[in-house]
Amino acid sequence: QGLSCQLMKMTHDHLRESGYYGAVLVPAGVGLFSMYEKLGYRGFCPMERRSVLPGVPAAIEQLDVEQYAALRRQYLPENGVLQEGAMLDFLAGYNRLYSGQNCLLAAAQEEDTLYIQEFLGDAEALPGVVAALGAKSAKVRLPGGSKPFAMYLGFTEDRQEPSYFGIALD
């Protein structure tokens, strides 16, 4: 086996010994899905990229990391992967964090385009958020479609596959 596979197996052993019940990852490319499948991972959480145009501006509020984390726990679907601590600090280092009516998002704006790294809530709110932030368009990844976004490897039989994994810094 290759060095990468050996390192992954060592990582899995360490995670099991540390009490984790599974591992989640986002392959860097489509071709890597098959490699991770050979290690026992299964694709889950289908997502699709969408473009959004502005609508009528909505009321939004900028948040700090702690506020975002608290609201994220409320917006996550049941059995969603809880990503906190260093991950949210890293996310906030490259994005601004916002809440709006029925939504929560992490986004960065480059020129006239808003790049939304995570969106939780009612997708109907997106056009208003795009307008409120002064963007001419947005790129966002939302649940749906047929292609899995992430992969999961369970270490125990008594846990079900996560329902949502949304933060990826691509």
What role is predicted for each listed range?
Residues 30-31, 124:
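Short alpha-helical
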Residues 8, 13-28, 135-145:
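Conserved GNAT acetyl-CoA-binding A-motif
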Residues 26, 32-38:
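Basic (Lys/Arg-enriched) interaction patch that binds polyanionic ligands
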Residues 22-24, 95-98, 103-108, 115-118, ...:
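Ordered hydrophobic segments in well-structured contexts
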Residues 1-17, 38, 123-133:
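Conserved acetyl-CoA-binding loop-helix of GNAT-fold acetyltransferases
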